[in-house]
């Protein structure tokens, strides 16, 4: 395989209440696999997938970190539209959805209560809901995954460590600060994806700590301690988009001397 196919495609980069960008979600894409991680808070996910030039018929794996609205409600739309294509004979194979018990139960209940019975009949045959426990290892296409509990006090949430074709390692911390108990699984990763709700200098405006979030400065300090090579910041406020890339990177760089990425919606980043 040509490893240059390995990419992160950020469909959205914002936190829950944003209106000027989409909620944080992304693809991990290889030559053979399009793994969707979270789906934002509504059917805007369909537009983002289309703009990213990804076909729904190529999506066979979805990982949902937790059951908050800005992460799971878009997944209902992805499942619905894939169900529609299955029934129309346009979609080959299965859709595998991975998540903890709360995620899987929530997604299925919303679908059962809102979708046509012909769609819901596909659960267990073509739509496979794969409940995972913390520490479970599994394959999402050609991406090797290990999920872990981020130990949130707010909502049961899983992050993951992924090994891409070619061996690059990527750790996604979900949308909460990295708990020190999870430092071993993230240490030395090639890529760390970490939330940064706002700048530390703007903490009194956006109040990240009251919302169980962190700042760009905090994320940089964690990345430095973990010895990762690349830090990607996401799940931000949307009031400073014009300066976000420069200012967030500058603040994180106070501690972290590796590569820092602060992507916009629909930006693709090579991860080889």
Please name every model-derived segment.
Residues 2-52, 156-175, 191:
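Conserved beta-strand hairpin/beta-sheet module of binuclear metal-dependent hydrolase folds
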Residues 8, 38, 49, 66, ...:
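Divalent metal-coordination and catalytic microenvironments
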Residues 18-20, 129-201:
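Active-site-proximal loop/helix segment associated with metal-binding centers of metalloenzymes
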Residues 36-40, 59-67, 100, 170-176, ...:
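Active-site neighborhood of phospho(di)ester-bond hydrolases with catalytic His/Asp-centered motifs
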Residues 43-96:
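Active-site metal-binding motif and surrounding structural segment of the metallo-beta-lactamase
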Residues 69, 97, 103-104, 236-241:
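Short histidine/acidic/glycine/proline-rich micro-motifs that form metal-
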Residues 91-156, 261, 265:
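Metallo-beta-lactamase
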Residues 177-267:
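Cap/insert and terminal regions of metallo-dependent hydrolase folds
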């Amino acid at each position: 395989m040509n490893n240059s196919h390995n990419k992160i495609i950020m469909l959205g980069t914002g936190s829950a209440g944003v209106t000027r960008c989409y909620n944080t979600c992304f693809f991990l894409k290889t030559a053979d696999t399009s793994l969707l991680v979270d789906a934002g808070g509504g059917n805007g996910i369909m537009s983002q997938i289309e703009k990213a030039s990804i076909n729904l018929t190529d999506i066979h794996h979805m990982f949902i970190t937790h059951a908050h609205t800005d992460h799971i409600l878009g997944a209902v739309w992805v499942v619905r539209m894939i169900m529609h294509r299955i029934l129309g004979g346009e979609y080959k194979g299965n859709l595998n959805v991975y998540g903890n018990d709360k995620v899987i139960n929530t997604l299925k209940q919303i679908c059962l209560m809102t979708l046509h019975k012909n769609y819901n009949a596909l659960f267990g045959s073509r739509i496979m809901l794969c409940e995972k426990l913390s520490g479970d290892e599994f394959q999402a296409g050609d991406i090797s995954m290990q999920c872990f509990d981020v130990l949130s006090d707010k909502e049961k949430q899983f992050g993951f460590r992924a090994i891409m074709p070619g061996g690059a390692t990527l750790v996604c911390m979900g949308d909460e600060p990295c708990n020190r108990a999870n430092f071993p699984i993230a240490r030395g990763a090639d890529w760390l994806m970490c939330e940064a709700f706002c700048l530390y200098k703007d903490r009194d405006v956006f109040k990240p700590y009251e919302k169980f979030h962190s700042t760009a400065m905090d994320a940089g300090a964690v990345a430095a301690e973990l010895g990762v090579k690349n830090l990607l910041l996401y799940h931000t406020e949307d009031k400073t988009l014009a300066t976000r890339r420069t200012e967030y990177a500058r603040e994180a760089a106070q501690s972290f001397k590796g590569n820092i990425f602060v992507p916009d919606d629909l930006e693709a980043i090579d991860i080889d």
